[in-house]
Amino acid sequence: MLIIFKDLNLVKTNNCQIIGWWKQLSLPQKTFLSFIPLFLVTSAFVLTGIVESLLTFGTIIEQIDKFTDQTNVMLLIYAVIYTFNPKSWLLKNQQFFLSALAYILFTFIGYNLILSIAGIAYKSTNPYKLTSSIFLHVIAPIAFFIASFIKIKHEKDVNINMFFKSLLLFMIYPLIYGLYLVTIPYVRHYLFNGRPSTYTIYGSITNTKNNPFAWLVVFAVLFIYFPLSYLAIYLLQLKLIKKAIQPQFNLPFTLNKWKQK
């Protein structure tokens, strides 16, 4: 009986600690925490796709090289770090947050607009794959947008990198991914109905080997869409936290000095 009472006291103590921890969380943290189960589901879809790719093709590249899957896993990573360790160096100067927001925005727009126009989006009639696609391309991105808006509205006293530095850091991932995107058709092939075919990530729209128009698409996305979309998100953050815009766009010291001459 004594052991039972000790166990009950331990449970009560743990419950009190959990309640205390929950109360000290900010509203944005609570919002991201509430979405972690959703991001776990989308990451499970990604993991299932990797296993399926391994069993079907004997490799996992057909799954892990998808921008959608990479950015959805990024949402889970960010939500976990922000909720449980908001002072982490990974979250310094809002760089991870703004970048993740811009990346998942492209996942949302790229799939539901660009790939839909190209006739690639939502083609599967398999209920599981269709459900997975909706979660990855619609539900999870919208959830992150909601949580992000709440975070920006409620966290006014934040440090943000100067725009050009922030943009440079943001562009590292798209540029690396873009380089992979345009080169993979030249180096990887697979058999389709017994015939060798060019491997592309998103069909003809990214087939830089056989479709010259694909180069224009990739160039436009990398050097026009990504910088402009990041600029829009960056300005939105500044506006919502009522931070002066002009100082954030000052050129680096060396460029300013050269400009004055």
Swiss-Prot record:
Q: What residues form the membrane-spanning segments? A: 31-51, 71-91, 101-121, 130-150, 167-187, 213-233
Pfam hit, one: DUF1600
Q: Which InterPro entries match?
A: DUF1600
Tree of life domain = Bacteria
Location in the cell: Cell membrane
**GO (cellular component) term, any one:** plasma membrane
**Key words, A-Z:** Cell membrane, Membrane, Transmembrane, Transmembrane helix
Topologically, how does it sit relative to the membrane?
Multi-pass membrane protein
Q: What is this protein called?
A: Uncharacterized protein MG452
In its UniProt entry, the species of origin is given as: Mycoplasma genitalium (strain ATCC 33530 / DSM 19775 / NCTC 10195 / G37)
